[in-house]
Swiss-Prot record:
Ca(2+) binds at residue 212. The keyword Calcium applies. InterPro entries: EF-hand-dom_pair, EF_hand_dom, EFC12. The gene is EFCAB12. Coiled coil: none annotated. Residues 196-231 form the EF-hand domain. Keywords: Calcium, Metal-binding. GO terms for molecular function: calcium ion binding. This is EF-hand calcium-binding domain-containing protein 12. Residues 62-85, 146-169 are annotated as: Disordered.
Length: 572
């Protein structure tokens, strides 16, 4: 045994190339001993309890349910997994198999039933399935029975479900939904006509004894309806035939269908009559409750004379013809009413009354003069006053815009341009002077100074006396001061009588080209508030000033300049 081991050991070393040769080259050289290396590498294999490692196991513990009752208390089985909803068709062996624990199985089935009922329309879901199980067919049968219990349910659907429900063996049969036509109004007309004539629907066909499922053809039905004399057109009779035949199994009319439809119509008539009777009873009771206190008042009051029933004019609803007044219109109406009441009580003339109204002022002279009422009589006065109020609002808006945009238009400029100076009532010797015309004065005495007018009125004798009484005052001035004084006088007073410019009367005559310039609005000549009429310049001004002016050409336009001034010529 030892010899075999040594032979095997030497063969293994020779294969590894670690065995020393029998004829060593150098006996003193160190020899590699592989035994410790092999013993170290194969140490685990030499142990007695050496075996392969086992695979890891995963154990899942399911919590115990209260409904679960184990058969053996020693060995408690795990609870079955929850049913996973799937759309696969159940096989026969899956249906027959039931778990051992019945309570658990019943709880799972009830839970599945609740989920199915809360899922949505169970009837539609089951009818659209290609194949159903016996339990699903049973549920569908119960749904159809519940619907057939209602009075307004269709008879065709109930009949098909009752026949198809017991057939549980046909699992793969598909439920085809049927269409139901709406009930034509001519059917109720026909039944009401027969009811008023006390004719039964089954008696007109003379087939009562032949059975309820006896079929009635289209020609027989039309002939019977015409024989009774029902007031219907041919198209309406055709609609009734189509509707009644759609309720049958083979698109035919039977006695059973006629009886059922007539019964449904009579029940609907009874419900409507009950509802109307209840409404009439409530209205009558309400009227009696209202008449009770009225009768007591009539008894207490004294007997009155009998009233004559005459024609009364119907009340006209004027709310649609009127409109609500604005605040400005209400204020104007109030002002007119107060003015009328005051004028009836006044003993002074109206023009003096208007002058008294002028005493109420706001403090700003321009505003007061603009807002004065006009002295013109008639309708023109109201138009002028409304125009002045409108212009005052325009002035306020322009002032706000100029202030917000920062335009260099002062308040004085806007007042001169937009506000009217107003009519001024002036008394002279207890007489009202006429309104000043453009370019003139109220009277001639204003042209002269007040001292000269006073002297003229007194006469020549009185004027001499006044000259004697008033001493002359002399003042010395230099030549330059006298020259400036005379220059100012020439500017103030022109030659001859004083004449005013015709445009001086109109507001804004000092503002030639006034317009509101806004940064966001393009410049437009039509926005000018006032335009001054001026003479157009001559086409060739050089012809009228040949001595001083001469046309000079600079590039592409012509300029007029003094010919003696310094000139710079450009040669293009």
């Amino acid at each position: 045994m030892d010899d075999d081991y040594e032979a095997y050991h030497s063969l293994f070393l020779s294969l590894l190339g670690l065995c020393p040769s029998k004829t060593p080259i150098n006996e003193n050289a160190p020899v590699f001993d592989p035994e410790p290396v092999i013993a170290h590498c194969f140490k685990q294999f030499q142990q007695k309890d050496f075996r392969l490692p086992q695979t890891r196991r995963r154990i899942i513990m399911v919590p115990r349910k209260e409904d679960q009752t184990p058969l053996n208390p020693a060995s408690q089985p795990q609870a079955p997994p929850k049913p996973i909803p799937s759309f696969k068709v159940l096989e026969a062996r899956d249906i027959q198999e039931q778990p051992e624990d019945r309570k658990t199985w019943l709880s799972q089935r009830s839970k599945l039933r609740q989920e199915l009922e809360s899922f949505g329309d169970v009837k539609r879901w089951l009818e659209n399935k290609p194949s159903i199980t016996p339990s699903e067919a049973k549920v569908l049968h119960m749904i159809h029975e519940e619907q057939s219990a209602q009075p307004n349910a269709s008879q065709a659907t109930t009949r098909t479900t009752r026949k198809k429900a017991p057939r549980l063996s046909r699992l793969s049969r598909q439920m085809v939904p049927q269409l139901q036509l709406p009930e034509p109004p001519a059917l109720s007309v026909m039944y009401s006509y027969l009811h008023s004539r006390k004719i039964k629907i089954l008696e007109i066909f003379h087939k009562v004894g032949q059975g309820e499922n006896q079929r009635i053809t289209r020609e027989e039905f039309i002939a019977a309806v015409k024989a009774v004399g029902v007031p219907l057109k041919n198209q309406e009779v055709e609609d009734i035939v189509i509707y009644l035949s759609s309720l049958g199994k083979h698109n035919t009319i039977t006695m059973d269908i006629l009886a059922n439809t007539y019964k449904q119509w009579s029940m609907a008539q009874q419900r409507s009559s009950l509802a109307t009777a209840r409404e009439h009873y409530i209205l009558a009771k309400h009227r009696d409750s209202l008449k009770g206190p009225l009768k007591k008042q009539e008894v207490d009051s004294a007997p009155q004379l009998p009233k004559v029933d005459l024609l009364t004019v119907p009340a006209v609803d004027t709310q649609m013809e009127t409109r609500p007044m604005t605040l400005e219109e209400m204020e104007e109406v109030g002002k007119r009413y107060r003015e009328r009441q005051r004028q009836h009580k006044l003993t002074i003339p109206s023009i003096q009354y208007t002058e008294q109204c002028h005493l109420v002022r706001c403090g700003n002279r321009h505003f007061d003069e603009h807002c004065l009422p006009s002295t013109i009589h008639g309708d023109m006065r109201e138009l002028i006053d409304s125009a002045r109020r409108h212009n005052f609002l325009v002035y306020l808006q322009c002032w706000k815009l100029c202030k917000s945009y920062g335009l260099p238009l002062t308040e004085d400029i806007l007042m001169k341009a937009l506000l009217y100076p107003g009519d001024k009532i002036i008394f002279q010797m207890d007489k009202v002077c006429p309104i000043r015309q453009p370019g003139g004065y109220y009277s001639d005495w204003k042209v002269f100074s007040p001292n000269l007018a006073l002297l003229r009125s007194q006469g020549p004798g009185k004027s001499k006396r006044t000259d004697k009484k008033t001493p002359k005052k002399s003042k010395k001035m230099r030549f330059k001061e006298f020259e400036e004084f005379t220059r100012k006088l020439k500017v103030k007073r022109s030659s001859g009588l004083q004449q005013t410019h015709p445009n001086s009367f109109w507001p804004g005559h000092l503002l030639d080209k006034l317009q509101l310039y806004l940064p966001t609005v393009a410049t437009d000549r039509s926005l000018a508030l006032f335009s001054c009429v001026q003479h157009q310049p001559h086409v060739y001004p050089a012809t009228y000033h040949p001595d001083h002016w001469w046309p000079l050409r600079n590039k592409n336009y012509m300029t007029h300049a003094h010919y003696d001034a310094a000139k710079v010529y450009y040669i293009n």
